[in-house]
A protein has these predicted regions:
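Basic, Lys/Arg-enriched alpha-helical interface segments
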Residues: 1-70, 79-83, 90-128
Length: 128
């Protein structure tokens, strides 16, 4: 086993296949923000749960905020060195609006619920 294994980066998708993170990135217009987002994902892939402040901030309920100059990327972890991106935000003021954080927490809850359903669905099929 390699101790330098990269983390798997995944995007949360809705039941309809929509990726809020991909939409966030597609909506970035400032070249600095685009470059910042790409660099942040690279650091996250390399360091995963070893990231600390000021680059990554643990919010509540397992939600994390990856912090660039203005770009914020929201994510959580799943077993197996998996990172799930749930969305992003370009910071325009000193504090992130509560509705943005509430939305990101809701998306992460969806991710965890889907993961639990998949575990329950496969638990009964082992050994068959």
């Amino acid at each position: 086993m390699s101790f330098n294994a990269e983390w798997s980066i995944e995007e949360h998708k809705t039941a309809g296949g929509r990726s809020h993170f991909a939409e966030f990135v597609a909506g970035l217009t400032d070249a600095k923000d685009i470059k910042d987002a790409a660099a942040l994902i690279g650091v996250l892939r390399a360091l995963g749960n070893q990231l600390r402040e000021p680059r990554s901030k643990s919010l509540e309920d397992g939600l994390f905020e990856l912090r660039g100059t203005q770009v914020r990327i929201y994510y959580g972890f799943l077993p197996g060195r998996r990172v799930v991106l749930v969305g992003g935000y370009v910071k325009k003021r000193t504090d992130t609006p509560r509705d943005v954080l509430r939305l990101m927490r809701g998306r992460l809850k969806e991710v965890r619920d889907e993961y639990q359903k998949s575990r329950v669905g496969t638990a009964g099929t082992k050994g068959r």
